[in-house]
Amino acid sequence: MAKQLRPMSALASTATSYPTTHEKIEKPTDTPYFVDNEFRPSQTDKFIELHDPATNNLVTRVPQLTNAELQAAVDSAQRAFPEWKAKSVLARQQIMFKYVSLIRENWDRLAASITLEQGKTFVDARGDVLRGLQVAEAACGAPEYLKGEVLEVAKDMETRSYREPLGVVAAICPFNFPAMIPLWCIPIATVTGNTVVLKPSERDPGAAMILVELAKEAGFPEGVVNVVHGAHDTVNFLLDAPEIKAISFVGGNKAGEYIFSRGSANGKRVQANLGAKNHAAVMPDCNKNQFLNAIVGAAFGAAGQRCMALSTLVMVGETKEWLIELAESAKKLQVNGGFEEGADLGPVITPQSKARIESLIASAEEEGATILLDGRGFKPEKYPNGNWVGPTIITNVTKDMKCYKEEIFGPVLVCLNVDTLDEAIDLINQNEYGNGTAIFTRSGATAETFRRNIEAGQVGINVPIPVPLPMFSFTGNKKSVAGGGANTFYGRPGIVFYTQQKTVTALWSSADAISQKADVAMPTHS
């Protein structure tokens, strides 16, 4: 039997206990849902099998909840909202402090669930948890963001503004960050006074189940945080439920544009981060060793399954000669099961993802690109049945090739050649995506030219994955975000998304009204 991190409580989620090896689980149990602070088995007859990506052994079955079960979660959140809203922000903050502490205490348990279900290396999975934890820590400072404004606008008259919660909100989360994305949503939504219905990815819900277990332990009342499961039917239910006032989504463009359109049509606020094709411009004056190390990590970490993975290089001038060295560095990466010591990257999420990635590599070959490093057909000796794609570098790519136009979402780096910085900027700006970009250079003037003219929402100067820390906000643009990027995640904009503004103007006159005639002209208070 696999080693267990913690004994399983009879009343707890299956997610409270996770192996730290990829050994076969002899008796997998079904994943429950979470309503009214309790784990409940679904009564559905429809389940989605979840397999360890390193072995394709069955880990659990995830239920497609019935409509009655979905409605129970929404009703729970709706019932909890008035009392939760009425709690002082300091009381909610104290619960958040406890929640942060519990996440830290259960860091390895959360990471183990991610490695088993999603495939990330254990070290990378710990980073997934940490980046979400940082948002939860920042949410503890919400009272500062929630402070309103006041102005004496005229004699005996003042105007005050308040930020108030929306009500029930929902989060639809992707497979690639099973802890981080739920933690982009739960802390900010709840500390501002909302209640939450969370749908983790059906491919790896375990981390979310641990997070709600910890939320209960931290002191969140019944109904404040609920978890539902399923695929399209669950998404549609959440989009249509009139009780839900806002939807948060991270994922691909097809799903995200659908969610934004249907959610908006139903009168909901929607924040939706979508796909990406993140470029880096490489200048001849850059620190070559720094560039080589940074790109190997940014392109191939998490098997390339990051919305901010640096998947495209724009080699300026002579830098194209460095790609041989880049391939040599990438060859040294250890591709293995995520629990194995020394593993640098694990498998991709499903056999279907592997097939799609390999087909895009093949298309590049057919269209005349060069496969400088080919990760197809790779199999670690210990795990021959996993969804393996090794690091792959494709050179001599042109922008009309399929491998360039599509988001590959795997450990594949495509490389294009240009002669000048201006050409690099033009090429990057012509791409329809705008999540992030980077430039590698020693020149401040070059960096400033790039910063000023580039059209991506998050820019790194010698930083390959410029995801902002939680005191800022995640600011993709163009087709990488729905709705023009108005509703962004975390930071002050995250607080704004989960709250609505109320403005109150009050007149407190010490003198009695002496006029006998009403004034029907537009009041100007001047």
Labelled PLM ranges:
Residues K3, M8, N57-R61, I244, ...:
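Conserved C-terminal structural/oligomerization subdomain of aldehyde/semialdehyde dehydrogenase
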Residues L5-A54:
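Hydrophobic face of amphipathic alpha-helices that form TPR/SEL1-like repeat modules
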Residues N56, R92, I114, A136, ...:
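Residue-level signal for inorganic ion chemistry
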Residues N57-L146, D156:
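Glycine-rich loop-to-alpha-helix module at the N-terminal edge of alpha/beta enzyme cores
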Residues V59-L65, A80-A86, A171, A280-M283, ...:
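Short, well-ordered beta-strand elements within core beta-sheets of diverse protein domains
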Residues F81, K85, V100-W107, A111, ...:
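Structural signal for hydrophobic packing residues in well-ordered secondary-structure cores
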Residues G148-Q290, V418:
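Rossmann-like NAD(P) dinucleotide-binding subdomain of oxidoreductase/dehydrogenase enzymes
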Residues K254-T398, L421-D422, L427, I461, ...:
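ALDH superfamily catalytic-core signature
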